[in-house]
Amino acid sequence: MSQSKKIAVQMDPIESIDIKTDSTILMIMEAQERGYSIYHYQPKDLTLKNGTLTARARALSIHLEESNHFKIGDSEIIKLYEVDVVLMRQDPPFDMSYITATHLLEQVHPKTLVVNNPISVRNSPEKIFTTLFPDLMPPTLITRDSEAIRAFRDENKEVIIKPLYGNGGVGIHRFNKNSFNPEILKQYLGLPIMVQEYIKEITQGDRRLIIIDGDYCGSVARLPKEGEIKANFHAGGIPNKTDLVFRDKE
């Protein structure tokens, strides 16, 4: 009898996951369909001892039944070099705990396939990575200099301020010349932030394109609620099936 294939999923507490919006749930269910045994652990459960990386993990099974969508086993220590795949699926913040997890997972990759490559994850924080394509972005500033932020706001009249390493629409604010309050910067704890020109077309939603191995597979529009600027699903954004437009094809 062949040995069961194993996937270890590094993610947030399974109890806190919203099965309606979390794509990791669908990935786990697909892996189950393909015969993989699934183990769940959090970044805090990683241990590196004498060159061996382990995780305090629990066997996990998922089914789409609200309020009763998972079954989880007792904790056990698993050696990550003995599993077939590790999926890095925890949400930001992109802090030292997150970065440390990428360093530890380097110990087993590529003998164990870590998706995505922990080196690439660490070196490509998503908001900074996008600045490699300035022609595809609205005017953008990354800084913690309040005077630079004020000058940028004056240039663009209305701006969006967001934490550089956050997620889910948390900490996003919209300002114009009359509403800007430099005191709001204190909530970012002195860290650099991203400031962008406000694009009024956001009320029509943004689009997420799904690319697999370089091929376009589909897209979804995220629509903000009426009167809101945040289209993030975690912030109440509404999904809507869509397709490519000319700008996307460029």
What would you call each of these model-derived segments?
Residues V9, L87-M88, Q196:
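Redox-cofactor binding/interface segments in oxidoreductases and associated redox assembly factors
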Residues E147, D154-K157, G168-E250:
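Phosphate-binding site of ATP-dependent enzymes
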Residues D12, D91, L164:
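Flexible loop residues that form catalytic
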